[in-house]
Amino acid sequence: MKSLTLIGLAFGASLALSTAALAQDIPVAVAGPMTGGESAFGRQMKNGAEQAVDDINAAGGVLGKKLSLQVGDDACDPKQARSVAEKFASAKIPFVAGHYCSSSSIPASEAYAEGNVLQITPASTNPLFTERKLWNVARVCGRDDQQGGVAGQYIAKNYKGKNIAILNDKTTYGKGLADETKKALNKAGVTEKMFESYNKGDKDFAAIVSRMKRDNIDLVYVGGYHQESGLLVRQMRDQGLKTVLMAGDALADKEFATITGAAGEGTLFTFGPDPRNKPTAKAIVEKFKAKNIDPEGYTLYTYAALQVWSKAAAKAGTTDPKKVMDTIKAGEWDTVIGKLGFDAKGDIKVIDYVVYKWDAKGNYAEINPKGS
């Protein structure tokens, strides 16, 4: 790629954009947790964006110009995300693929809207991101009311008559997903025995594990991220609990297995059908493998976000964010994760969550793989 710039952690860090590069290239950005507890997903996003920019540039770029990629680190912190967004907006970057955490994407989107920046998130699933109907937002992933619905139905079908617990980490993503799962579960006629919260960043779950043990919990659904979920499942096993842990898409990184070790076997989570298995992704997956990168989780979703924007800009004949967004919503776009169309709010029109299971070797696979 032509250039790669990282926006650091400090709020006062300057946006290191080369004037010469800007004169020749079109600056685009990826923003997410490049540091902090969710940095594994930031790496996924950065890998996906870098490969997409390389491939777009190799094919001639956009409107006759190469793309230059900027990287913003929000550490999944809302204030830091807003700061990153303001810097990108002041630099007149027309497009950002980001962010990862919903608690980052939502405040960042307001700064992008004010600064005339188009934002497509590969990963933020909280419904509020698009329900506010900002002109500048879209996502290439599903929503928690859809993901929670699949999880709730799965639990109701497979754990009927069992003792269920629901936990959440109080974050925008975690609490929202837990609430949607509870809603679907209750609608199916199942009432959870335990509903509790913890704080993101907690490491000691002894009190929660003790209550689960006392209440004979068969399955615990966690609305939260992979670090805390991994520690929880380890502590459950240490206390002799065979309780199954189920969570959402935040478990779609092999760092979860690094945290859990053998204790993670049998853990369930929801995510879209594995894009690595799609025929549309075969050539791109091979490129990643040649670099010794596993394009898991949101890697290919980030790649797809860049594809949608670049194709729409080419069709619109401009990088003007509002004109490109109008073009995005008016069309359908062939991407590495399949054909995508968007509704008026910026949500994709076809959603298809499935359930995955972690195995003893630290790998995950769809329980009922669809492969396309």
Residue ranges and their predicted role:
Residues 1-11, 23-372:
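Extracytosolic ligand-binding ectodomains
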Residues 17-23:
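Sec/Tat signal peptide C-region and signal peptidase I cleavage site
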